[in-house]
Every structure is written in C-alpha cells, then in structure tokens.
A protein has these predicted regions:
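Interfacial helix-loop-helix junctions of multi-pass membrane proteins
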Residues: 132, 203-214, 271-291, 470-482, ...
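Early transmembrane hairpin module of multi-pass membrane proteins
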Residues: 63, 69-71, 77, 112, ...
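Polytopic transmembrane helical bundles with strong interfacial aromatic enrichment
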Residues: 1-416, 647-650, 654, 661, ...
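Hydrophobic core of alpha-helical transmembrane segments in multi-pass integral membrane proteins
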Residues: 31-43, 168-173, 193, 375-376, ...
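Hydrophobic transmembrane alpha-helical segments that form the core helix bundle
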Residues: 266, 527-617
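Functional transmembrane alpha-helices
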Residues: 200-205, 209-242, 272-275, 290-305, ...
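Juxtamembrane membrane-water interface segments of multi-pass membrane proteins
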Residues: 84-109, 232-253, 274-283, 307-333, ...
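Membrane-interface transmembrane-helix boundary segments in multi-pass integral membrane proteins
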Residues: 284-296, 361-368, 417-425, 564, ...
Length: 752
C-alpha cells in the first residue's frame, strides 16, 4: 500500500454507482441519529440521566453535557481524520510536477475547517456544562460568570478544560490558515495534542492504576479518531472519490491505517476494561453490559474492515485502462480489436462499479455501528464503574503522591519480577519490533539481504526500552532516587546504542517503495524529517553532545524533575526527551543512517571522551551533594527502607559507574567502524587502480618526461634541421626505459 497507482489523480476512472451523493448526504445525519438513539437508551438504562439526590444539575447537566460530549468527540474525530488523510493518503496536487491542487485534497481541508470550527464551539459548550454538572444546583445561585471564572482558574478540572479549549482553537486557526503539506501536518499535530489532556481527565490521579488507565485511554482516543474520522471523511467526499483512477490505492492506504487503529482500540479498550471491571459479576452491572455491547460493536466493525480487505479493495480501480484505439490495417481486424477493447473496458467498469457499490454500503454500515459505539462511549463516561476510580479511604503517602500502590521492598530479583506496564510504551516497543521485522521480511521476499546483526541490535534496544519503561526500574523509579537514576542511565546511555546500530531509517528507505503520485507516506515523511534543518541541528555532533550532557544539569537542578514525577505527561516527556538525546548523540558517533552531519573519525573520539568525562563529574557531584534533589517527592515517599540522602548518593554512584560501560562500548564500536571504513577505502583505491591499469602512475611519469625534454632544449649549434628519425627513435626509446628517473646532475651535454 505504500506504492501508489501509476496513474495520476487527475486521471478519472469510471466506477460511479449513483449511490455516492446519497452517501455524502446521509453519512453525518445517519451517524447522529443512531448515536442519539443509542445514547438515549444507554443513559436511561444505566440511570446516568436520572436526577441525583444531592447537587443535581438538572436536565441541562444530565442531558446537555452528554449531547455536547457526543458532538465534541465526533467533531474531534472528523477534524483529525480528515487532516490525517490529507497528510498521508491523498496527493496534494494532481501530479508530481503539477501545481494544481487535487480536488479531493482541497475538499478534505474544507471538511477539516468545518469540523474544527464545530469542535471549538462544542469544546466551549462542554467546558461550561462541565462546570454546571460539577457545581450542581449551586451553578445558578449567585453570579454565574464569576463562579465559572473561578472554576476555570482555580479548579484543576476547569484549568485542564481551559487548556483543551485553547489548543483546539489554535489548531482550528492553523487548519484555516495553512495549505502546504508541512502546514497541514503541523495543524494535525496541534489538533492531536488535546488527546493527551483528555486522557488525563478520564481517570483520577489519586486512584490506583493511574498510569495504565491514562495510557490506555490516550491510545484508545488516538485509534478511534483516526479510524472514525477517516471513515466519515471518505463518505463526505464520496462523489469525487469514486471517479478517481487511484481509488483502490486510496482505499488501501486508509485500510492500513484503519487496521492499525483497530488494533490500538482493541488493546486499549481491553486494558481499560480490566481496570474498571473486576470479577465476572461486574460484567452484569449496567457498566459491564454497556461495555460488552460496545465491545460487540467494535468486533463487528473489525469484521467490516476485514470484508473491505478481502472482497472490495482488490476489485477497486487502481488505474482503469482506457479502450485501445484501432491501429492501421484491414477493416475487419480493426473492428475486432475495437470490439474486444470495448468489451474489456465494459467488464472492467462493471467490476469496479460493483466493488464501489459494495464499498459504500459497507461504509454506511460502519457509520451506523460507529454512531452507536461513540454514543455508548459517552454513556460509559457518565456511568460509575464497578471498580471505582477514586482514591482509597486511607491512602499511603506514596499513593497520595503517585496514585500507585507502594511496591514491596526492592531486591535484585524484584527488579526483574515487578512490572508496571505503560500502555503507551508497550505499543511503541511492540509496534516498532513488528514493523521492523515486516520490513526485513519484505526485503528478503524480493531477494535483498539485511544484516542479521542489525536486526538483533534493534530488537535488543527495544527490549531494553521496554524494561526501562515497564520493568522494575520504572516501578521503583518513583520510589527510590537510585532506581530512577538506573532507569535514566539505561534510557539515555544503553538503549540508544543498539537502536542506532539497527539503522531503522536505512531499512525504511530500502523496504518501502517511494510514492509516485505526489502523496507522502511514511517513507516520505520520515525522510523529510530526517533531512530537515531542525533534525540536522539537533543531530549535529556538538549540539548532540551539549544536549546529552547539559540536559542532565537542567533536569536535575532546575526543579523540572518534580513535574516528571508528579504528572503523567511530564513523565512521558522525560522518557521521550532523554531517549532522543541519547539517540542523537549515539547517531553522531556510531550511526550509519542518513541525515546526520558526522565529523571524521579522529574528531568523534575526543567528543565522546569529553562528553563522558562531564557525565562522570555529574555523577560525582550527586554523590557528594548534601541537598536532596526533588526532596519534596523522595523525602515524603514514606517507604522506610533507606534514608533519602543515602539513596541519592547511591544514585550518584550509579550515574558515575554505569556510564563507563557504554563509553567503552561506544569507543570500541567507533574503533571498529573506523577500521572498517579505512579497509573499505583501501580496497576501493586498489580496485580503482586495477581498473585503470596504473594509469595515474604512467601519467605522472609522462609528465616528468615532458619536463625533462623541455629542460634539455635544442642541441648546441643546431641549424634547425630535424633530427634523424633513427636518432629521435633511439632517444625516445632510452627515455621510455626509465621515465620515472629524473636526469642526473653532471650528465654530459648532447654531442654537437
């Protein structure tokens, strides 16, 4: 699906069925109607819309907020889905060398603009109605605007929603103002940022399982919005889409995205369900029944997607062949050829039209299922789960700080037996391993080779990353400073080395075919990012070294570390930043992927040694420090195992000691690469000499001979008569016997 159809999007096929205008008109109303029906039934059946005894917000809160949330979620999906299709599925222009904007690409941006405007307005409505629902009857007692202002400036829930509204508004402005590929991609990134904040609101920070709940909810939202949003976007541009000659390629690309989204939705949904549903009896509660119904709808949606891939996509036109014009010759053969071409064209159009008709029917069916599933998602958010996401009645000090249960006292074995799976990094590591292996398989299937040691290195690096983010180092990293330092050192100094040796960008360039229709897939976007001036700046050896070493000082001595411990977003950003810092530094020293401005080997070694020496001094400074780093956190954990200052000194020892092994490893790898590079250069020079037959040496000798002849000049007393042929041949023969030997001093002059 990475390779595009050879026909340009401007070339029109003929797979229209007459149903496309009805699909475009009916898609959104059908989605809303089914959603309203399913949502109403769910709210009534679960009792979520029933009045409460205390602090009832009235019909405005009980019914208005779910309606606003349904509109909010739908507009969010449509905005992000349409932008994603414009960025990675559709070509921006009608041809690679054309400046004319593709009509469907333009329509997608129109869909995104309308959806983003609705999303912005609905976010304001959700903010206000969330205040009404939270305040209850008191919302309308006193000054409404003043109380609302206090809610969004003093209460955490209101502050988060204010940030969400601001991000959505900024994203909407970018959607309306930017039209380039890079601009639309930037609008997509900004529009996706509210998902992080929405995932935080879905679970109490003080309740157990906060990391798993927030991570799984963020993955769930990402999967739903790109799946549902892409589907609705295709329906809204149905008439123009069916006339395209590259319809099959477009649908295949979206189908791949939908398959990935389906896997994300199923994994995250099951993870979240297991956190909120305990035993078998919990599945019979109102929450459990709605959850089972939503799961059944998701399975049906997966079956519809499987039907697309099995029975539809292969029959859609990638490029509909035009009837062949008759060639010159007798009238009878020309007529036969014209008739055969007409019959073939008619059969092709009939097959394409039948596949398109089935495709749009399945799309409408999926929209119906998605409408019900989206509404039931709102119902679940309004229904109390069997396992409440509320803080325990008597929380421990660590539960108050982190929202997690204090693990048992650490031992060497428990660092490998205690696990806390972060769904975000589970998806990243497992997904990166699967995609890498699929790329290697694609190379092998077409007869190309890929070094096995690079595959092993990549998988080893991902295994280290998986342990660092989900294993014992992560479990104890928020309890003990020493465990945090172990996690940090493995993240920034150990995991990046095998990941860099895996050469993922090189594999991507070889494994994925470039697109020919002007659209940008994964290959094009990765290469654009790798060769961008921002990537070149941060991957510059000096900048990478400063970032690698300087980030330690800024992170540990500026107070930023508190946010990485206290907030989920801060924790994820910490992992992402230090992994990137270590990766850029290792890439500048031992990497082979393109896009990095690497210094010669003799310069890289001093950069490595200076950087690691600074790192050693950093560890010594922590060992000798008498002030607690992040003392408000590590000083109040309350584990009673070891004093915080002693544990911090142990962390300094880890920072100082563990850095020696990666440094030695980097130096050895650098020396090996240096030797291999010199060997390859010598062999290349030898092959060049073998091909030229010592032409360079012969040219040099000829130059010396010419200089010698010029220095000798004409013979003394010469009358200008030419030298005899015999003498000239003899002289040339003597010179040719030793052209590389210069004339000796004191040699007798030529005879007169």
């Amino acid at each position: 699906v990475s390779a595009s159809a050879k026909a340009t999007p401007a070339t029109r096929g003929d797979a229209t069925t007459g149903i496309e205008p009805q699909v475009r008109i009916a898609a959104v109303p059908l989605f809303v109607l089914i959603g309203a029906l399913a949502g109403s039934i769910g709210l009534i059946a679960t009792g979520a819309a029933a009045p409460t005894v205390l602090a009832d917000s009235g019909p405005l809160g009980r019914w208005g907020l779910p309606i606003a949330e349904f509109v909010f979620n739908s507009a969010m999906a449509l905005t992000i889905g349409s932008l994603l299709l414009a960025v990675v599925v559709f070509p921006r222009t009608t041809g690679r060398k054309s400046s004319r904007i593709d009509p469907e690409w333009n329509r997608l941006l129109g869909v995104a603009q309308v959806a983003s405007a609705v999303w912005t307005l609905s976010s304001v409505a959700v903010l206000v109605l969330t205040y009404v629902d939270t305040a209850g009857a008191q919302a309308f007692q006193g000054e409404f605007s003043g109380q609302l202002w206090s809610f969004i400036t003093e209460i955490d829930l209101g502050r988060v929603w204010l940030a969400i509204v601001g991000l959505i508004a900024v994203g909407s402005m970018l959607v309306f103002g930017l039209r380039s590929f890079a601009g639309v991609a930037a609008a997509l990134v900004v529009s996706a940022l509210p998902i992080l904040l929405l995932s935080i609101l879905g679970h109490s920070a003080e309740a157990d399982g906060h990391i798993e709940a927030v991570g799984s909810l963020s993955i769930h939202l990402v999967g739903v919005v790109i799946w549902l949003g892409g589907l609705l976007s295709l329906a809204l541009i149905a008439p123009g889409l069916t006339r395209r000659a590259d319809l099959g390629s477009i649908v295949a690309r979206y189908s791949t995205i939908a398959l990935i989204a389906y896997a994300l939705v199923m994994y995250s949904g099951l993870t979240n369900a297991l956190l909120r549903v305990g035993g078998i009896d919990d599945w019979l509660t109102p929450y459990g029944v709605v959850l089972v119904t939503k799961l059944a709808l998701t399975i049906l949606l997966g079956f519809a997607g499987w039907s697309h891939r099995r029975a539809v996509i292969g029959r859609l036109p990638g490029a509909v062949p035009a009837p062949t014009a008759p060639r010159t010759g007798s009238d009878a053969p020309a007529a036969n050829r014209e008739g055969a071409a007409s019959r073939a064209g008619a059969a092709s159009r009939a097959t394409a039209s039948g596949a398109a008709l089935l495709f749009w029917r399945l799309v409408l069916g999926e929209i119906v299922l998605f409408g019900a599933a989206t509404a039931l998602g709102v119902v679940l958010s309004r229904t109390a789960p069997p396992v409440p996401d509320e803080p325990p009645a008597e929380p421990t000090a660590f539960q108050i700080l982190s929202g997690e249960t204090l693990p048992p006292e650490p031992t060497a074995a428990r660092y490998f037996t205690e696990w806390l799976f972060d769904p975000i990094w589970v998806v990243i590591t497992v997904g990166a391993a699967v995609l890498y292996l699929l790329a290697v398989k694609r190379l092998r299937d077409r007869g190309d080779s890929w070094p096995i040691h690079r595959t092993i290195c990549w998988l080893l690096g991902l295994a280290v990353l998986f342990y660092v983010t989900c294993g014992g180092a992560s479990v104890y990293g928020r309890v003990l400073f020493s465990a945090h330092m172990l996690q940090h050192m493995a993240l920034v100094m150990i995991a990046p080395i095998p990941l860099v040796l895996g050469a993922p960008v090189t594999l991507l360039m070889r494994g994925l075919a470039p697109r020919r229709d002007g659209s940008r897939g994964v290959r094009e976007w990765v290469l654009a990012i790798v060769h961008s001036r921002y990537a070149r700046f941060f991957s510059h050896p000096i900048v990478a070294a400063i970032n690698f070493a300087g980030s330690l000082i800024v992170f540990y001595y500026s107070g930023i570390m508190w946010y990485a411990l206290d907030t989920h977003i801060g924790h994820e950003l910490m992992i992402l930043h230090f992994l990137a810092a270590g990766y850029f530094f290792a890439q500048s020293i031992i990497g082979v992927d393109p896009g990095v401005n690497r210094y010669p080997y003799p310069v890289r070694l001093p950069i490595l040694l200076v950087t690691m020496a600074f790192h050693a001094f950093f560890g010594i400074s922590i060992m000798s420090s008498t002030a607690l780093i992040a003392g408000d956190w590590y000083g109040n954990v309350g584990h009673g195992w070891v004093s915080a200052i002693e544990d911090q000194a142990r962390g300094g020892e880890i920072a100082w000691g563990i850095g020696e092994f990666p440094t030695l490893g980097l130096a050895i790898i650098l020396a090996v690469e240096w030797f291999q590079s010199s060997t390859r250069e010598a062999k290349r020079s030898d092959r060049a000499e073998d091909r030229s037959g010592d032409a360079e040496l012969e040219a040099y000798n000829a130059m010396l001979a010419g200089l010698a002849a010029a220095n000798e000049g004409p013979p003394k007393g010469s009358t200008g008569a030419p030298v005899g042929n015999g003498e000239r041949s003899k002289e040339n023969g003597e010179r040719s016997t030793d052209r590389s030997r210069p004339p000796q001093a004191g040699s007798p002059p030529a005879e007169e």
